[in-house]
Amino acid sequence: MSKSRLTVFSFVRRFLLRLMVVLAVFWGGGIALFSVAPVPFSAVMVERQVSAWLHGNFRYVAHSDWVSMDQISPWMGLAVIAAEDQKFPEHWGFDVASIEKALAHNERNENRIRGASTISQQTAKNLFLWDGRSWVRKGLEAGLTLGIETVWSKKRILTVYLNIAEFGDGVFGVEAAAQRYFHKPASKLTRSEAALLAAVLPNPRRFKVSAPSGYVHSRQAWILRQMYQLGGEPFMQQHQLD
């Protein structure tokens, strides 16, 4: 290898190492800060806003209103656990069994990719990372997930998740969603309304709370059954998530 190539390689290596240190400090500081402080915005919110501006849509506003867990209906927390991650109170950030099932499914159905992200993983991804699928992003997501699982309580993870989850075009967080779709605060959401909001979470840019498709209605009904099977509101109290 020539001297010039060695110099370029050395420069790139130093740059990447420094970048990794900067990102580690930034993300580590974010994890520490948001363990107690309200989250003003997420990486996904920034990405959506910038994308709208780049496409000339200056009317788009990524909107979110932070609320604490005691200002959120217990049905809402239960609904997203029933819909997205029923082992949330028990795991350490990853549901290994679900990951194995998703990998097996994806091998058989390459055109219908199934995910297995837990609420903890989705929180890490939405808060700190860009959208998309890549091994680099998955690796960073895993590290950030371990970080928030180590520093935050399960209640804190659920609180942040509910405040940054995307529920529609420009609608982020359960308070903004409750006000937009039901004209009430998140604390007043009923069991059925919570299940409807949770039903669009797989793809809130495709599935609409304001105009639910047959699939969304069937998923809402399934979530309601799962909420009942989990034990209803006592489930949240039992795991200190309310």
Curated annotation (Swiss-Prot):
CC terms in the record's Gene Ontology section: peptidoglycan-based cell wall; plasma membrane
Encoding gene per record: mtgA
Keyword set, alphabetical order: Cell inner membrane, Cell membrane, Cell shape, Cell wall biogenesis/degradation, Glycosyltransferase, Membrane, Peptidoglycan synthesis, Transferase, Transmembrane, Transmembrane helix
HAMAP family referenced in this protein's UniProt entry, alphabetically: PGT_MtgA (MF_00766)
Superkingdom classification of source: Bacteria
Keyword Metal-binding recorded: no
EC number: 2.4.99.28
Subcellular location field: Cell inner membrane
Natural source organism: Escherichia coli (strain ATCC 8739 / DSM 1576 / NBRC 3972 / NCIMB 8545 / WDCM 00012 / Crooks)
Catalytic activity: [GlcNAc-(1->4)-Mur2Ac(oyl-L-Ala-gamma-D-Glu-L-Lys-D-Ala-D-Ala)](n)-di-trans,octa-cis-undecaprenyl diphosphate + beta-D-GlcNAc-(1->4)-Mur2Ac(oyl-L-Ala-gamma-D-Glu-L-Lys-D-Ala-D-Ala)-di-trans,octa-cis-undecaprenyl diphosphate = [GlcNAc-(1->4)-Mur2Ac(oyl-L-Ala-gamma-D-Glu-L-Lys-D-Ala-D-Ala)](n+1)-di-trans,octa-cis-undecaprenyl diphosphate + di-trans,octa-cis-undecaprenyl diphosphate + H(+)
Membrane topology: Single-pass membrane protein
PANTHER family on file: BIOSYNTHETIC PEPTIDOGLYCAN TRANSGLYCOSYLASE, MONOFUNCTIONAL BIOSYNTHETIC PEPTIDOGLYCAN TRANSGLYCOSYLASE
Transmembrane residue ranges: 19-39
Protein name per UniProt: Biosynthetic peptidoglycan transglycosylase
SUPFAM superfamilies: Lysozyme-like
Annotated GO MF terms: pentosyltransferase activity; peptidoglycan glycosyltransferase activity
Function: Peptidoglycan polymerase that catalyzes glycan chain elongation from lipid-linked precursors.
UniProt record similarity statement: Belongs to the glycosyltransferase 51 family.
Pathway field: Cell wall biogenesis; peptidoglycan biosynthesis
An annotated GO BP: regulation of cell shape
Gene3D superfamilies (alphabetical): Biosynthetic peptidoglycan transglycosylase-like
